[in-house]
């Protein structure tokens, strides 16, 4: 029973990890894969331990040269969590991304020991062991998983899921497929087409090497029975179809790192094969790897398919990830090491580093407002978030694995079944390492890394030792192991309960996003978002969203004709409490400080001391993100408000412009301050400089026109307002201001036309109606009595 559970958990993990997703949570892929990984690994570990303690009555543990390196790596990841800038993120993963996390990495460590102690490598002629899981079971599960990934992706690319969903809806609306599946770029690996390309390139390398070596071994084994030959022929046909299906997807995705990974890995495979003369008796087994190598080289340097497909085709409309460049990612990583050399910013905390150290050049890009939570490649994240200890432990782990594997495949029995299997695993592992230099890692890629690592270690038969402690010889060990088993069991049960609450909370949060409802002040009437916050009190993100939702309710209440003061006070208290809770949980996350700062900004007239608290909080936010002109400008506005320190405000607005010279809000606000102080020339200069840098900004054009209007330079004001209207034809402020200019110039007809247009956009506006009445009276003179012509 225990052995069957272990085998099921291992095979289910290998098969399901690339495929598993659920639409019930906010993020369908990484979040659910993490739960699957933790649950199946924990069940497998319990079954393995239970089999030793309660059935075999002995502890059997395989010792390998890599075990200490794995434990050292897990230890450094734990240290990186303990000393993290944001421990919640390090433990559970950055919300929305979820990988890496300490729980996920420890689960992968458990998976490694589960594989190395319960899987054995067997040739086709060897009998299956009753005690261990055969490697063929896991390889078959992995190949079938790849097959379903490929099939699912083709269905998505060519709209089959949409057609299936529409057909099901025609039968019953409740049968509709989840929204995530009808998205054209859907694939079960993740929401990223690029990650899919990386995964497929690694899968292709493994399959090409594995099938070549499998064919070589079959040839050596000689004649087979008729049934076995037919079975092998069917498998060969299936594998060829799968490999060329993968190639088709790679051609559609056409992601250059995927081609590079395949190119370098297959090149290493061919060089080693020729050097060792592995295929000297039948070089035809190398035909397919050579073909794929040539294709990868061609598509790495050229794009032969470019222009062959229409602009609206699937090939030309695949979604792509927006990520920091290689240069930016490496720069931020080294800045993180400088700040915290040993353990970095903490596991999963790349967002902290990016916010704090993003370069000035990034602010000139079109995506300058994005706070990236991951770099473009995994090694930069490892360097910045886990420091020297993390990188060193990881490199030693990889180095030791490569060293022992190379020793085995270079040994005297390099052409044996065991060595050939090791070589196919080694090539896939090398492909994974190459991938980590060029793209970031998700849960699936991390799992595949540890899967090949564990299988490679299992193939080191000669250097793997077994240690056995029989309970008959050591009764004390039996008692200790029994206690350990129950302690681990209850520990896992506690984690199941805790993580179950977190999962239900996320389901509530997704329900709120799909159907937003009013925030309730009484806990017994809590909506979905409030229930999420109550269930997952340790999740910072829910408190941030709750604070913003309460703030929205507060603004809505203040806009009521007769606001309820008691209700206002209650909402203010709840808003501040949620903002403070978020800061308490993650004081080094800029979004928590920013949210609380904006709360204090919006309640200045409702709560005593809000200005002082707002200044303090935003100053802390700016420490965490010094190159954010928005935060600096919002801090400046606190000084424009109650404190009235105009010089400080001007200093901060200028600082915001130093950070980003074309930031509209700072330039406009500074221009208004200069205008109010009578420095009209400086105000005009600021606006001229702004519109030259951001000519398409409606706000800049409107404010420039307003400035000219106040100076009675009506022609220049008209020019700016008209440009603003060209950019945004329904911009009410520009249309209204243009009407005022025409009214000042005495052109009441045009003025009336502008005001009526504003009324169409803002029906029922009393001020506009009064303005129209005023202009109408002036433009319609009283009728004079007729006079008879003189004779």
Language-model features, listed with the residues they occupy:
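Alpha-helical transmembrane segments of multi-pass inner-membrane proteins
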Residues: 2-23, 39-49, 69-81, 101-126, ...
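Hydrophobic alpha-helical transmembrane segments in integral membrane proteins
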Residues: 302-317, 480-520, 541-545
